[in-house]
Regions:
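Hydrophobic alpha-helical core bundles mediating ligand binding, dimerization, or RNAP-core interactions
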Residues: 31, 46-50, 73, 81, ...
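Short helix-capping segments at alpha-helix termini
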Residues: 35-39, 83-97, 130, 154-158, ...
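Active-site neighborhood of HAD-like aspartate-dependent phosphohydrolases
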Residues: 2-51
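Hydrophobic side chains within well-formed alpha-helices
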Residues: 27, 42, 104, 155-158
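Alpha-helical elements of Rossmann-like donor-binding domains used by nucleotide-donor carbohydrate transfer enzymes
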Residues: 29-30, 45, 75-79, 107, ...
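Short, acidic loop-to-helix structural element flanking the phosphoryl-transfer center
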Residues: 70-74, 90-137, 147, 175
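A metal-dependent, Asp-based hydrolase signature
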Residues: 40, 53-106
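Asp-based, Mg2+/Mn2+-dependent phosphohydrolase catalytic module
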Residues: 1-13, 126, 138-245
Length: 245
């Protein structure tokens, strides 16, 4: 964890969902079963394209092309399958592609609602709950996806809020997405801790005004844009350092 001066104890904690609480790459095993030799690459490209699509529909033409996260997730998966798992010499119409690969698409999308939670998450959430700290999710995911994944992980009783950006039709890192945290909890961003394993998300939340923790699970450098998160940790247990007993 980074050596950072002490900060005031946050009044609440908001977590990103995908990559932070839930392992988006846990779909790789099923992807490998469906597309032998391509599972890991497919899961990586799927995630990258998913994030790219959220940025495209948020920034282009003032959000006129917005689509919910589940729609973009499906579109990103189709792209990844076409690029990685299909012979480049094979030409398929969109209709024929869906006929040929609809079962695999649906299986992977269903798995996305049952992503593995990182092993330290449950005890961390339980400790925060025991201290009476309001905790929630602020995610690009739409409500249906989030609720299914939260239920699958057994986190329902531990979370006070599950906030989707869908009502504002803008994905993070748009300020209106982060503002939902303030609106929902009735607190200023500076009084809350925002936790994300996605560096771009931790950066966006820092710019917005949150106290931030970047969960650097993969030991990567932070974004080179002149701003650092409040603290950096290697897993979710670093959250507890903001709340010394």
């Amino acid at each position: 964890m980074s050596k950072i001066p002490c900060v005031a104890k946050p009044q609440a904690v908001l977590f990103d969902a995908y990559g932070t609480l839930f392992d988006v790459y846990s779909v790789a095993q099923l992807a490998e079963e469906l597309f032998p030799g391509h599972g890991q690459a497919l899961s990586l490209l799927w995630r990258d394209k998913q994030i790219e699509y959220t940025r495209l529909v948020t920034t282009c033409n003032h959000g006129a092309h917005y689509q919910p996260f589940n729609v973009l997730t499906r579109a990103a998966l189709i792209y990844a399958i076409k690029k990685i798992a299909i012979n480049p010499d094979e030409t398929l119409s969109t209709g024929q592609f869906l006929v040929d690969f609809e079962p695999e698409i649906e299986l992977l999308l269903a798995q996305y609602q049952h992503l593995d939670a990182f092993p330290e998450n449950l005890p961390v959430l339980q400790q925060l709950k025991a201290q009476g700290i309001p905790i929630g999710i602020l995610s690009n995911g739409d409500a249906g996806m989030l609720n299914a994944t939260v239920q699958s992980a057994g986190f329902n009783s531990l979370l006070d809020h599950v906030i989707s950006v869908d009502p504002v039709r803008k994905f993070k890192t748009h300020p209106e997405a982060y503002a939902l945290g303030e609106k929902t909890l009735g607190l200023k961003a500076s009084d809350m801790l925002f936790v994300s394993s996605n560096a771009w998300d931790a950066l966006g939340a820092t710019w917005y005004g949150f106290t931030t923790l970047w969960v650097n699970r993969y030991h990567l450098p932070f974004e080179e844009l002149g701003t650092q998160p409040t603290r950096i940790g290697s897993d979710l247990r670093a959250v507890l350092d903001f709340f010394p007993s």
